[in-house]
């Protein structure tokens, strides 16, 4: 025992607390000196000694019919600094009041010492009846460990839990696997969550426990070593599990050392501290990213091997009496009861290219899976490969063939990634496996994200995607060959983590891949351009003024043709959706659709002239007039004309006919000088906040502060000033989750905005700090675009997306007498990437001195 208990009798809670602190200090000082298994078992031994001494002091050892038994993680001797003390007090019969009082005092003492205690008092008969009804109780009893008391009584409990009528092998197995299925669903079937749970995430410690429980129930194997000795796992599987288990134990132990309350989630602030304790080093976030890469790789190995062994148990133990249906596929493969099997265990060693045929057959037989024996042969073969699979000409042909098979991403490429075949095929893949970026934007590792992009592309073929992604669905469904898009998706982030521009490096990688695989010059150029430019459409749509003809022209010139536009649109939408499920919403859908349509029009018109928006303005006026005639027939045409004469042409370009008609219906007979209306009916993809009032100081500041205080996301701001000094302000907002705003919330915001605009004072902004943002730093960057423009100035601001940022920026605009014409508000995880169109107080573009003043004030106040 590394840290023996050294407390004299009688024990006191204060003395125990001091001894626990001494133990924790010992563990902190010796964390890197001892193996993690020694530290974990030492804790268990410490608790054993404490509980046995306390049991004896309470006089419970003098009672013949009562025993103290460790269960759960304590029963397994897996005790971490904040683990619960789980134990069973096994009694021969219901305790008499005197014994019951001693048991109560025993448990109360542990509570007084600050322990989290999970306890039960049961007879053998109660253990049987309750264990039969509850798989959790049955599992706890299965891993029971005797501490002190009546040993024969404990042995009787052990015999009970082994009986087939307590839990049959099949019943126990199915119940535990169902628990795993439900647990995986809670974590979206991926281990690669932003702030993962060491215990419950897929591939976490619970997956190891499942393997342990099944083996324990089946054969009584107590440890991984016992399972190895039984022949149930191979030596290399044992080695990988043991290494991964040791790493997760280290992370969990370190986490518990830095916390004061039990938790197994690796939150951002904890990742930093744990990485330091584990000895990871590097500049900036490198230490955390290195640790998390090791962490996710450990989860992946545990998930892969434990699920493979669970499948092996199902196929070779539970299904051993099942009737066999065999279908011969070719000389090397056969289908046995819908499981793909090798006809010769040496196939993959002798003919490595045939590894890819295994996944080809998965695409051809929708209900089939891969037999566990074949998966094990696959793992052995991958470890022994003398070269990358892509170096084998036959393998290259088979790899390309996969892209054109039905459900190829779901049925072939996802499993290929899961089982390590992509690593064996692509030289660059291993570098991105488990690579997590320490930010709030990318919620998956780079490899997981890449496969999700490919899977999202494949989903565009489904009819369900027609409503959510109408343009991508139409384009992707009509493509005769989708191979190029899938390859572009495979490579779009493959160079991350190397340093340098990942898009530029990835473009070189994909060009080399394409040449190696025999693609022609046009295909090579298209692939390289797609990877190099995969962020172009996203930046243009979300951070530029797409109603500016020059922006559309510049984008069209970069894209060059309709084919590339189609490819880029599909890749961009898939990339956004696969980065973070909360990023895509109806507002973004309308934004990208508009850019796509404008660019289509530019290609159709030709590249010699800018798009003529005067036609767009006239068309929108005409359509708005038709809507007004149909839906608002009581409005006099002369009133409409008088109102529209006050509006600049820009107003009719930037608003849809429905919006124009709605605004007109509200304003044409308006008497008041202030109007705030909010609706979901007229703006594509968001809730529109429409404000009409006389221009006033700090107007934008008041509006954004109020909207922010009510916890809405602002996506777009448009300020139109009439010739007589009134403003038509339109803000596109959503709830924080991207949903449209419901009626009660709209009415509440209308009232709040009206009060704010009637007040001469600026209300103080109530800011609730974001827990996650506290652990990130974003370097503030102010960039002025197209500085030769004379009519306005375009500015891009990158900063930490802290609460009140937009209100702070608008306050600075007010203080410098700057007019805001338009704004695009984009949040990328913890980073705000906002775009503003400004003029000075004379309605002109800012000169160099004014730009420099603005830049310095922003840096001084924001970053």
Swiss-Prot record:
**What is the required cofactor set for this protein?**
Mg(2+)
Key words of the record: Hydrolase, Magnesium, Multifunctional enzyme, Nucleotidyltransferase, Repeat, Transferase
Q: What's its EC? A: 2.7.7.59, 3.1.4.-
Biological-process GO terms, alphabetical: regulation of nitrogen utilization
UniProt protein name: Bifunctional uridylyltransferase/uridylyl-removing enzyme
Offer one Pfam family short name for this entry. HD
Q: Domain comment?
A: Has four distinct domains: an N-terminal nucleotidyltransferase (NT) domain responsible for UTase activity, a central HD domain that encodes UR activity, and two C-terminal ACT domains that seem to have a role in glutamine sensing.
The residues covered by the HD domain are: 446-568
| Ranges for domain ACT | 688-772, 794-863
NCBIfam families, alphabetically? PRK01759.1, UTase_glnD
Which CDD domains does the UniProt record give?
Answer: ACT_ACR-UUR-like_2, ACT_UUR-like_1, HDc, NT_GlnE_GlnD_like
- The record's region (Uridylyl-removing) falls at 329-687
Q: Family per UniProt?
A: Belongs to the GlnD family.
Keyword flag Repeat: yes
Tell me the segments the record calls region Uridylyltransferase: 1-328
The answer on whether this UniProt entry bears the keyword Repeat reads yes
Q: Which GO terms describe its molecular function?
A: [protein-PII] uridylyltransferase activity; phosphoric diester hydrolase activity
Q: Could you name the domain of life of the organism this protein comes from?
A: Bacteria
Using the record for this protein, list the coiled-coil segments as residue ranges, or answer none.
none
The record describes the protein's role as: Modifies, by uridylylation and deuridylylation, the PII regulatory proteins (GlnB and homologs), in response to the nitrogen status of the cell that GlnD senses through the glutamine level. Under low glutamine levels, catalyzes the conversion of the PII proteins and UTP to PII-UMP and PPi, while under higher glutamine levels, GlnD hydrolyzes PII-UMP to PII and UMP (deuridylylation). Thus, controls uridylylation state and activity of the PII proteins, and plays an important role in the regulation of nitrogen assimilation and metabolism.
The record's catalysed reaction(s) read: [protein-PII]-L-tyrosine + UTP = [protein-PII]-uridylyl-L-tyrosine + diphosphate; [protein-PII]-uridylyl-L-tyrosine + H2O = [protein-PII]-L-tyrosine + UMP + H(+)
Concerning InterPro entries, the annotation shows: ACT-like_dom_sf, ACT_dom, HD/PDEase_dom, HD_domain, NT_sf, PII_UdlTrfase/GS_AdlTrfase, UTase/UR
What regulation of activity is recorded for this protein?
Answer: Uridylyltransferase (UTase) activity is inhibited by glutamine, while glutamine activates uridylyl-removing (UR) activity.
């Amino acid at each position: 025992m590394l840290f023996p208990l050294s407390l004299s009798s009688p024990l006191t809670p204060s003395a125990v607390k001091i001894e626990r602190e001494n133990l924790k200090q010992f563990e902190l000082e010796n964390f890197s000196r001892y193996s993690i298994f020694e530290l974990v078992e030492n804790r268990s031994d410490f608790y054993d000694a404490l509980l046995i001494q306390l049991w004896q002091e309470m006089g419970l050892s003098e009672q013949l019919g009562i025993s103290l038994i460790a269960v759960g993680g304590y029963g397994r001797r897996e005790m971490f600094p904040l683990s619960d003390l789980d134990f069973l007090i096994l009694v021969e019969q219901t305790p008499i009041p005197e014994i019951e009082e001693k048991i109560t005092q025993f448990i109360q003492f542990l509570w007084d010492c600050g322990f989290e205690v999970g306890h039960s008092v049961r007879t053998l008969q109660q253990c049987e009846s309750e264990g039969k009804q509850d798989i959790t109780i049955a599992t706890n009893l299965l891993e029971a460990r005797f501490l002190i008391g009546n040993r024969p009584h404990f042995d009787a409990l052990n015999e009970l839990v082994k009986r087939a009528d307590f839990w049959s092998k099949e019943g126990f197995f199915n119940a535990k696997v169902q628990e795993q299925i439900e647990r995986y669903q809670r974590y979206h079937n991926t281990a690669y969550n932003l702030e993962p749970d060491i215990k419950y995430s897929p591939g976490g410690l619970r997956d190891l426990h499942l393997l342990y429980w099944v083996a324990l129930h089946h054969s009584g194997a107590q440890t991984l070593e016992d399972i190895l000795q039984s022949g149930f796992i191979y030596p290399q599987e044992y080695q990988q599990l043991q290494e991964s288990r040791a790493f997760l134990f280290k992370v969990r132990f370190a986490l518990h050392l830095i916390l004061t309350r039990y938790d197994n989630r690796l939150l951002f602030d904890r990742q930093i501290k744990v990485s330091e304790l584990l000895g990871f080093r590097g500049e900036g976030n490198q230490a955390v990213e290195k640790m998390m890469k090791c962490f996710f790789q450990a989860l992946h190995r545990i998930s892969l091997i434990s699920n493979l062994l669970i499948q092996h148990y199902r196929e070779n133990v539970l299904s051993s009496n099942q009737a066999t249906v065999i279908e011969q596929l070719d000389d090397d493969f056969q289908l046995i009861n819908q499981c793909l099997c090798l006809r010769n265990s040496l196939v993959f060693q002798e003919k490595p290219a045939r590894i890819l045929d295994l996944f080809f057959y998965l695409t051809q037989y929708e209900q089939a899976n891969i037999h566990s024996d074949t998966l094990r042969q696959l793992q052995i073969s991958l470890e022994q490969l003398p070269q990358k699979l892509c170096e084998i000409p036959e393998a290259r042909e088979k790899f390309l063939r996969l892209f054109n098979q039905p459900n190829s991403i779901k049925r072939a490429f996802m499993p290929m990634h899961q089982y390590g075949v992509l690593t064996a095929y692509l030289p660059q893949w291993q570098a991105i496996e488990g690579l997590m970026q320490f930010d709030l934007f990318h919620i998956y590792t780079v490899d997981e994200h890449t496969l999700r992009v490919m899977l999202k592309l494949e989903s565009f073929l489904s009819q369900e995607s027609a409503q959510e992604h109408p343009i991508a669905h139409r384009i992707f469904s009509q493509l005769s060959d989708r191979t190029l898009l899938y390859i572009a998706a495979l490579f779009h982030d493959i160079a991350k983590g190397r340093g340098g521009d990942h898009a530029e490096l990835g473009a070189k990688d994909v060009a080399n891949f394409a040449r190696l695989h025999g693609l022609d010059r046009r295909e090579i150029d298209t692939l390289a351009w797609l990877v190099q430019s995969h962020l172009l459409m996203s930046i243009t749509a979300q951070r530029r003024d797409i109603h500016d003809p020059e922006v559309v022209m510049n984008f069209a010139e970069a894209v060059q043709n309709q084919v590339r536009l189609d490819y880029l649109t599909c890749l961009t939408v898939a990339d956004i959706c696969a980065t973070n499920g909360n990023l895509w919403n109806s507002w973004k859908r309308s934004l990208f659709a508009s850019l796509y349509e404008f660019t289509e029009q530019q290609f159709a018109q030709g590249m010699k002239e800018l798009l003529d928006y005067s036609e767009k303005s006239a068309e929108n006026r005409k359509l708005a007039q038709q809507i007004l005639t149909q839906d608002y027939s009581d409005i006099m045409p002369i009133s409409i004309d008088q109102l529209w004469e006050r509006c600049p042409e820009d107003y009719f370009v930037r608003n849809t006919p429905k919006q124009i008609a709605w605004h007109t219906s509200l304003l044409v007979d308006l008497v008041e000088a202030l109007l705030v209306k909010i609706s979901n009916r007229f703006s594509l993809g968001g809730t529109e906040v429409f404000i009409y009032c006389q221009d006033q100081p700090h107007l934008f500041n008041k509006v954004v502060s109020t909207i922010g205080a009510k916890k809405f996301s602002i996506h777009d701001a448009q300020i139109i000033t009439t010739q007589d000094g009134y403003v038509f302000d339109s803000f596109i907002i959503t709830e924080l989750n991207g949903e449209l705003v419901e009626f009660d919330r709209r009415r509440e915001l209308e009232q709040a905005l009206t009060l704010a605009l009637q007040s001469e004072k600026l209300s103080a902004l109530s800011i609730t700090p974001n827990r996650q943002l506290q652990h990130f730093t974003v370097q503030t960057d102010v960039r002025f675009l197209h500085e030769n423009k004379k009519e306005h100035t375009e500015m891009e601001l990158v900063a930490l997306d802290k609460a009140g940022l937009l209100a702070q920026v608008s306050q600075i605009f007010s203080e410098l007498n700057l007019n805001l014409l338009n704004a695009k508000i984009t949040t990328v995880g913890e980073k705000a990437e906002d775009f503003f169109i400004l003029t000075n107080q004379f309605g002109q573009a800012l000169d160099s001195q004014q730009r420099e003043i603005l830049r310095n004030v922003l840096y001084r106040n924001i970053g």
